[in-house]
Amino acid sequence: FNTLFSSLNNLGVKVLESIALVLELPKNFFEEKVIRGNSTLRLLHYPPIESDSNVLRARAHADINLITLLVGAEEGGLEVQNKDDEWIPIKPNSKSIVCNIGDMMQLITEGNLKSTPHRVVEYSANDSKSRYSMPFFLHPSPDVVLKSVYNEDDKGVLAHDFLEERVKAIKLY
């Protein structure tokens, strides 16, 4: 577990380096912010569905963190919402990793990078199988101030407070 977690964290830092360069920030802009982050690795199991087709296995939502790395699933069902509000299926590939932008990244980029709404559906109960997903949620350290990368006067919000507010809003506690 520790090796996998460390590898995904290192990959996440590399993705953040690329994002920083696209945003015309120093390459290591995010590194200090995530070095002691609250990142989480989860294993999700979606059991087979026995009812009608088009069942939602996970309702539409966006992730709270900076970025999420979704380690390749072998079963389909993941869909992302595009800017026209259409749901686009992501073709499963066990050798790929999908990267979603989270709400914290959307906040600090003032919406220039949009948080990715996504859901998990079951297309056909006749062929339903268990689906496993392994998301790595890359979070900054709780004491990091999330503020605009474009506006130096932005007071921002503590990552801990932002996370707590969102978790309460979606009734996770």
Regions found by a protein language model. Name each.
Residues 1-173:
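C-terminal flanking tails of non-heme Fe-dependent oxygenases
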